[in-house]
A protein has these predicted regions:
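Helix-loop-helix hairpin linking two adjacent transmembrane segments in secondary transporters
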Residues: 167-215
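Cytoplasmic membrane-interface "Motif A"-like loop-to-helix N-cap segments
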Residues: 89-100, 334-348
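Extracytoplasmic
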Residues: 24-55, 138, 288-293, 387
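C-terminal ends and interior cores of transmembrane alpha-helices
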Residues: 101-118, 348-362
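Hydrophobic core of transmembrane alpha-helices in multi-pass small-molecule transporters
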Residues: 106, 119-137, 365-395
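Extracellular/periplasmic helix-loop-helix junction of adjacent transmembrane segments
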Residues: 46-78, 310
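Extracytoplasmic gate region of multi-pass secondary transporters
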Residues: 42-43, 268-323, 327, 383-387, ...
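Cytoplasmic helix-loop-helix junction between adjacent transmembrane helices
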Residues: 127-169
Length: 471
């Protein structure tokens, strides 16, 4: 009976841990989905702006729309590196909530331009730059929070693959919401997602628990006890056991490892190759994010051109494919224990998927939907895997003795480098599309090929390691 008591106590602690983990996973999922939803309106309203809203109408319209994309993405990429450094040192809950509220404000400002009759290119560019800066804090924060709660999970790839579907879910929600209200004026396409992200920012501020220690939970002690440890009582740092909260907070801060330096993080094994791979992979993914509705609107399907609203809604098929692609990549990488091999496989298969979509997607609606789904599946698979499971692996690897305070910096380096490519893709598309969409798809295929090049050595090392382990 005496042995049963500690075991029962450990089981209760494990139950508390699991419930808190699910809550954190759900809240961060919703938070980052709202970031992506608020980024979707520019792609939905592109065709409307290019038709009759100066300064985006006329022959230079596509160029200026591309410049609008690059204003956001270049600011996002530049600020991302600083945001990761800040997230490793700041209160993650407050920083994430502030970023969400500020993102809502910048998106609302863009929507207000419709109602106020603003036609200044400088205004749109400034609003996009401000939006990019404040949104850059979102990713390092959510990755660090999830890493705090799931950093020791053996099925990290699967967990992260499912969780990272927030990217595609957010894109889908943003597309549907923006397209649904587009008929009332394009300003509403910005205002509705702005309200959603601001409201969720308040929820994050009130309810998010950024670290298990903040909830009085010691993950390592609980796992040891449940896996047949010494039988001693599991250490719970809060609620039932804490006597002096102020003293506890001081002790918790004292136990935290030092945050890793920016250049030190770049030198960690695997960080640079995956970062540059994501540069080209994200270039492709974000070209679809920002230009797919425009592409669908201006390319007939079964001989018919779709409306602005129908084009926006149809584009969500790419993101639905991306959801399943990200989950599949996470499952496969966990099963074979090879992140680089999995990413390389998806990148390789995305090349024929893009060729098929461009060549046969216009035959019928069924062809368009099926091939768009296939393209989204393979394009978003490696992008999802690298930004989540790979970044978490690299941010907690043995070289830094599992220092969880490196997580935000490493994830910011990887996603920030990818975001430079994300800025370049839509910008190039704005210029190249005037020469024909075949040229755009050629650019995308070249980008995927270059992404593959950066993974060749890592994939080879993983294969050799697996073969050696069997012998």
């Amino acid at each position: 009976m005496e042995a049963a008591a500690p075991a029962s106590h450990a089981a209760a602690a494990r139950g508390r841990l699991r419930s808190r983990q699910y809550a954190v996973l759900g809240l961060t999922f919703a938070a980052y989905a709202s970031f992506h939803a608020s980024r979707k309106p520019p792609s939905i309203v592109k065709a409307v702006l290019s038709a009759d809203w100066a300064p985006f109408s006329g022959p230079r319209g596509p160029h200026r729309l591309g410049e609008l994309d690059v204003a956001f993405l270049s600011a996002y990429a530049a600020a991302m590196f600083a945001a990761g450094h800040l997230a490793d040192r700041a209160d993650l809950r407050r920083l994430l909530a502030a970023a969400m509220l500020a993102s809502g404000a910048t998106s609302a400002a863009l929507g207000a331009a419709y109602f106020l009759g603003v036609h200044s290119l400088a205004f749109f560019l400034a609003a996009q730059v401000a939006s990019g800066v404040v949104q850059s804090a979102g990713w390092p924060c959510v990755v660090a929070v999830v890493g705090n709660w799931f950093g020791h999970a053996s099925s990290r790839g699967t967990i992260m693959g499912v969780w990272n579907s927030h990217t595609s879910v957010g894109n889908i929600a943003g597309s549907v919401l923006s397209a649904a209200v587009l008929e009332f004026g394009w300003g509403w396409s910005f205002l509705v997602p702005a309200f959603v992200i601001a409201a969720l920012g308040v929820v994050v501020l009130v309810f998010l628990i950024a670290h298990p220690m903040d909830a009085g939970l010691d993950i390592e002690a609980i796992e040891v006890e449940m896996n047949g440890g010494s039988g001693e009582e599991v250490e719970l740092l809060g609620e039932d056991k804490k006597e002096d909260e102020d003293v506890l907070e001081v002790e918790a801060v004292a136990e935290l490892p030092r945050a890793i330096g920016f250049l030190e993080a770049w030198r960690l094994p695997g960080v640079a190759p995956f970062a540059f791979c994501l540069f080209f992979s994200k270039l492709v993914a974000y070209t679809f994010l920002y230009w797919l509705p425009f592409y669908i609107r201006h390319n007939a399907v079964a001989g018919q051109f779709l409306s602005h609203k129908a084009s926006g809604i149809l584009s969500v098929v790419f993101d639905i494919g991306g959801v399943l692609g990200g989950i599949s990549a996470g499952l496969l990488s966990d099963k074979i224990g090879a992140r680089a091999v999995t990413s390389a496989l998806f990148l390789f298969l995305s090349i024929p998927a893009l060729i098929l979509y461009r060549t046969y997607g216009s035959i019928s609606m069924h062809h368009n939907i099926g091939l768009m789904f296939l393209a989204g599946y393979f394009v978003n698979g490696p992008y999802s895997l690298i930004t989540t499971a790979v970044a978490t692996d690299l941010g907690t690897q043995d070289a830094i003795k599992g220092n969880s305070r490196a997580l935000a910096t490493v994830s910011a380096i990887i996603d920030g480098t990818g975001s430079v490519g994300a800025a370049l893709g839509p910008l190039l598309t704005g210029y190249i599309s005037t020469r024909g969409w075949n040229s755009v798809f050629f650019m995308l295929i070249v980008s995927i090929s270059l992404a593959l090049v950066f993974l060749i050595r890592l994939a080879k090392d993983e294969i050799v390691s697996k073969i050696s382990a069997r012998h």
